[in-house]
Design a protein with these regions (language model features):
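A solvent-exposed, acidic/Ser-Thr-rich amphipathic alpha-helical stretch
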Residues: 4, 25, 31-77, 82
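Short, low-complexity N-terminal intrinsically disordered segments enriched in polar/charged residues
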Residues: 1-28, 32
């Protein structure tokens, strides 16, 4: 069972890693077989794709994304908790509301993640 305290710890560490621009700390939350979906992937990667598969591809995507967003900052708005999943609601440096949902594997790493923007 995924509880509120575990979700809060994850969210705070995840947001801090992003705000510190620490790609290795960010990636430490994810399984090697991560599947990540975001409407931003196509713009950043310059290809008509909506998902990345695997930690190496995720590292490549986020390295480019961080380079394109020197003012990146995420502010926590709320956390929603499910049985083996959670959603972090946050406001980004562009003042956009973002909902990022994480589904965890049995080892507590993110196996699938979906980002949605207002």
């Amino acid at each position: 069972m995924f509880d509120k305290a575990t979700a809060e710890d994850f969210a705070r560490d995840w947001l801090a890693a992003w705000n510190d621009r620490d790609i290795e700390r960010i990636l430490s939350h994810y399984s090697d077989e991560i599947i990540f979906h975001s409407p931003r992937i196509a713009k950043v990667m310059g290809k008509d794709i909506k998902s990345v598969f695997g930690k190496k591809a995720l590292r490549d995507y986020w390295t480019k994304a961080l380079a394109l967003a020197p003012q990146l900052f995420f502010e926590l708005d709320d956390i929603l908790v499910g049985s083996d999943a959670m959603t972090i609601l946050y406001t980004n440096h562009r003042e956009e509301l973002v909902a990022e949902t994480f589904i965890f594997d049995p080892d507590g790493r993110v196996a699938r993640s979906v980002a949605a923007y207002r």
